Amino acid sequence: MPQQKMRIHGQYVKDLSFENPNSPFLSSSKAPDINVMVNINSAKLEGTKNKEEVNEEKSFHEITLHIEVKATVKDEGIKDGVAFICETKYCGIFSIENLKELSEEEVRQALFIGGPTFLFPFAREIIARVTSSGGFPPLMLDPIDFETMYEQQGQQQKSNGSNSNFN
């Protein structure tokens, strides 16, 4: 199996929002229920394919780690029970070298496992800071096993007879 080489060329917050709809009336001392949704998208950046001196192809991709957190509490004084909603799209620009020697599956694994694994700690810190700035204790998301997530998505697609991209 050829060795893949993946490099990051930049990372950034593409979108960030925090809603605190019941402030300053949030008086519940109950711990909120936390619901976390994670999606991963990859977009090939056009016009970035080139031939290196050693005749290797390089492909550039923007990988987006989209995390949405909704905290709810069961309290009669809180409208809709929403304590806060935090959403971020954290992106990285990655290149994959030795592209001609890699299978489509190896490229997908690099994009949907390697990329998000690199980006997650940075997105996690942003969410912790934003929730703290919103008047809540910093929300420290549990680590995510992107390899298991990728495998589960693949099994789900096989059972549905779908070959669509991993999201």
UniProtKB/Swiss-Prot annotation:
One of the proteins required for the normal export of preproteins out of the cell cytoplasm. It is a molecular chaperone that binds to a subset of precursor proteins, maintaining them in a translocation-competent state. It also specifically binds to its receptor SecA. This is Protein-export protein SecB. It comes from the Bacteria. Belongs to the SecB family. One of its GO terms (cellular component) is cytoplasm. It holds the Pfam family SecB. Signal peptide: none annotated. One of its GO terms (molecular function) is unfolded protein binding. The lineage of its organism: Bacteria, Pseudomonadati, Pseudomonadota, Alphaproteobacteria, Rickettsiales. It is found in: Cytoplasm. One of its GO terms (biological process) is protein folding. Homotetramer, a dimer of dimers. One homotetramer interacts with 1 SecA dimer. Keywords: Chaperone, Cytoplasm, Protein transport, Translocation, Transport.
